[in-house]
């Protein structure tokens, strides 16, 4: 059973590859950058949608990259047979759909369009499929949300703490890897939300990140009036700051029922912010 993985060098692939090796499943990892082969993993150079070498039939294809290029490659890749397909989207497909920021609404539209194109390609090819919509990802030190905050705090010894009452549900990258394996074994043929095993306020989430750091940092509460000022003065922060009091959570009931995956609660430690 050979598994092709796009995005294998990313934060979820960091956890998926060792788990596939532990199952004894050969892996073909596709990357734009060269990598040395390792036991059970063969790396090939390629990029979606039109710079991927011809692949012989495989049992499963996993993609952690942009959906639309992957869907378009898959639709034209008849040589792969009818493998099981697992791909990640994002809960931003929902949470940013009604954003006040046009660029964020466009992100949501592209995610939804990519999901639709992938499902259509799978149905034409007769592939079983699962699309995972994770919430805020952490755990490998490669995310663009919590890790930059943690590293900045370690450099400056100060941790800005926005006061946000909206709920968050961070999901560990390894739990997405576990969900991927479950979807290979039991394809759901649907889009599944994937949040962490715990919901907490944005303020509590930032507090736990601060407590996880390997050195003491000074908490700097950011008052609401300052957040409003920054929201209007810095356009690129308008969307994220507007969502501080919004609930950005996932309903894991279908994930648990169909894949029997139960993500861990949010208990970060210092290793979560180290580059994996």
Language-model segment annotations:
Residues 180-239, 257-276:
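Mid/C-terminal beta-alpha module of Rossmann-like enzyme folds, strongest
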Residues 151-171, 175, 193:
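A conserved pocket-lining segment of Rossmann-fold NAD(P)-dependent short-chain dehydrogenase/reductase
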Residues 105-130:
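Active-site Tyr-X1-5-Lys
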Residues 3-23:
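N-terminal Rossmann NAD(P)H-binding glycine-rich loop of SDR-like oxidoreductase domains
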Residues 130-148:
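Flexible, glycine-rich beta-alpha linker
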Residues 109, 144, 168-171, 200, ...:
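Residue-level signal for the nucleotide or nucleotide-sugar donor/cofactor binding architecture
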Residues 29-34:
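N-terminal Rossmann-fold cofactor-binding loop
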Residues 35-82, 87, 91-102:
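NAD(P)H-binding glycine-rich loop region in Rossmannoid oxidoreductase-like domains
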